[in-house]
Amino acid sequence: MEITIEMIWQKFREYDRLYFNNELPMPLVQLLKSYRLCGQFSCRKIIGRRRVKGQLLEISCYFDWEEDALRDVIVHEMIHYYLAYKHIDNYLTHGEEFQKMAEELNSKYGLNVTVKIDTSKFKRAPSAPKLGYYLSWIF
């Protein structure tokens, strides 16, 4: 399926309710035109206040997503967001806390959230440029 910003907003709200107890404020959402990154979460911290600002969730529109794979990528980025929001991991790493939370969600809800994903198995979205897709097979 090809994705839209509205679709990501809807899925964010659904996954926040299902997996994060509605604790995460809605971030800004953008579509990435990248075959190298499936998703990315970024934010900045307000020094001295322990607040997270400028939350940005980006999901690649380069791929023709299957429902489960898209869910796992969005939840992966939401784990980064949750850990930053709760000041558990302020560096947005795939460290011990990330892996522990991913394992808990995977076992409790039957997800497949991983640190890395093999995008060579994904189909290119019909609207995605072809050159980058073929370059992804070379590099």
Give short role names for the model-derived ranges.
Residues M1-A69, Y85-F139:
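Metalloprotease/metallohydrolase-associated module, dominated by Zn2+-dependent proteases
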Residues D72-A84:
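Active-site recognition of the HExxH zinc-binding catalytic motif
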